[in-house]
Amino acid sequence: MSWLQVVVLSVLQGLTEFLPVSSSGHLAIASRVFFEDDAGASFTAVSQLGTEVAVLVYFARDIVRIVKAWFAGLFRAGQRSADYWLGWWVIIGTIPISVVGLLFKDEIRTGARNLWLVATAMIVFSFVIAAAEYYGRQARRVEQLTWRDSIIVGLAQCLALVPGVSRSGATISAGLFLGMHRELAARFGFLLAIPAVFASGLFSLPDAFEPVGEGMSASGAQLFVSIVIAFVVGYAAVAWFLRFLVRHSMYWFVGYRIVLGTVVLVLLSAGVVSAI
């Protein structure tokens, strides 16, 4: 990989990871349109470590509070607060993507990054996001979450394994369909992503150096710089996005997704870019 590609894709990763627009889809599209080759699922997974560190830093107080409450409630039934249960919901909600990710890891790294699929997913899932915004009651608080909610949002997170869907788009939409407030759905989705993304990134480190079957190799220095850039840009993006959701809906991103997906389909049909 060239340093220009590393910098551009890392900035793009940081900007899009927390927005409902699909960071993996954007990286796959940008790689083919501007660099004529896919950086690969392994590079994407490793660069996501930077954005997940950004989530850890941004939610540090929340995470510490949840961990303390979880351990306290584990040994003292009388101290089982909402944060204690939230800790359990994050653990339970991580199970679906762990299972699906292991079962379909080869498909995710190769066939799922076909630009026809990416562009189609970008467009189709836009309507799911719009429906979630339209039908969501936005009445439920964190104290009202149950294990069923965590399983459903966890299953929705599995959809993000398909580039073009969007992890935040899928989890926030699921939360809205379940009646959660928009900001709660976003925060819960971001917390839910931490274990899965860290596991995926660490698991993909060897393949980022020597990709198997697709993608280009990256040096250790390039991967380190990628993680740092994604962290800095990602921290700014998550802070902005959560403030944005307080007063605005995700409709703003629906139109963008449809336009981008359509443009990619046109470029593919015209033979301007390669699908794989």
From Swiss-Prot:
Transmembrane segments: 1-21, 39-59, 84-104, 115-135, 188-208, 222-242, 253-273
Topology versus the membrane: Multi-pass membrane protein
InterPro entries hit by this protein: UppP
Keyword Transmembrane part of the UniProt annotation: yes
Keywords per UniProt: Antibiotic resistance, Cell membrane, Cell shape, Cell wall biogenesis/degradation, Hydrolase, Membrane, Peptidoglycan synthesis, Transmembrane, Transmembrane helix
Top-rank taxon, per record: Bacteria
Gene Ontology biological-process entries: cell wall organization; peptidoglycan biosynthetic process; regulation of cell shape; response to antibiotic
Main location per the UniProt record: membrane
GO MF annotation, one: undecaprenyl-diphosphatase activity
Catalytic reactions on record: di-trans,octa-cis-undecaprenyl diphosphate + H2O = di-trans,octa-cis-undecaprenyl phosphate + phosphate + H(+)
EC number: 3.6.1.27
Subcellular location: Cell membrane
UniProt GO cellular component terms: plasma membrane
Record function comment: Catalyzes the dephosphorylation of undecaprenyl diphosphate (UPP). Confers resistance to bacitracin.
Family statement drawn from the similarity comment of this UniProt entry: Belongs to the UppP family.
Name recorded for this polypeptide: Undecaprenyl-diphosphatase
Encoding gene, per UniProt annotation: uppP
